[in-house]
Amino acid sequence: MDIDSLNNKLKICFVLPTYNEEENIENIIKQILEEERNQSTDTFSILVVDDNSSDETQDIVKGLISLNQKIHLITGPKKGLGDAYKRGFEFAIDELNADLIFQMDSDGQHDASLIPNFINYIKEGKDVIIGSRFIDGGTTPDFSFSRLFMSKVGNLLVRYVGGITQVKDCTSGYRAIRTSYLKELDFSYLSTRGYSFQSSLICDLAWRGADIFEIPIEFSSRKGGDSKLALRDQIEFLLNIPRLGFRNTKDFIKYSLVGMSGVFVNLGLYTLLTRYYEVSEL
């Protein structure tokens, strides 16, 4: 990799999937643009991928677009987080010519002030930066015991079945990814449409040799609105775990029995816990 090229001015696109985020979307967009104003090296663009929200999300974004041409909006049917990211990645690469793509939640749970840290590590030669809740310094202060338990078990299964034990937080939604790797992705393999797309994506990037680095983040509660994570997303995530092993044959043979049994145990625990606790994003 040409390290000198990493120090040039980058075109950075922030892909923000939305569905009924009228309470949050304007704030996160303004926070991102504020980070651009705080530096003079790179150019930012923001792409909102809206799944036909039934609230005022689209109208709010269109109003912001009228004031700032760095903001873009594409819409489509509600098919899940993974489908939204696939469409967003393609637009960011083909239409916006992005060098670097950020994944961020649109609900205010990710601290935009950390954006410069992500960019600095990319310019040092890393390919993927993950905002991690599960390395030293990372925190989840608002997680209930059940939510933290489910998240850690899910991550453990992905790490070992997928053969990416070096990654501590496989389901984090706060990432920066060099588009040179996204261009190589086999989206037919990444067939998951829901939140399990996040774990499939990071496994695929690792298998392709991407240099992945994690930085600690504090993952706080959403600022407004309701969580979009449904039971079907949790089930898809669990059922997708054994599939990750087929792209990593050596580790799959070693961990397949553990992974398969873990999926069903995890699914049973999830069903039990959801009767008594609020379970949200993995």
Question: Where is each model-derived feature located?
Answer:
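Short, well-formed alpha-helical segments that are part of the catalytic scaffolds
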Residues: 21-37
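Acceptor/aglycone-binding surface of glycosyltransferases and processive sugar-polymer synthases
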Residues: 76-94, 98-100, 109-195, 222-238
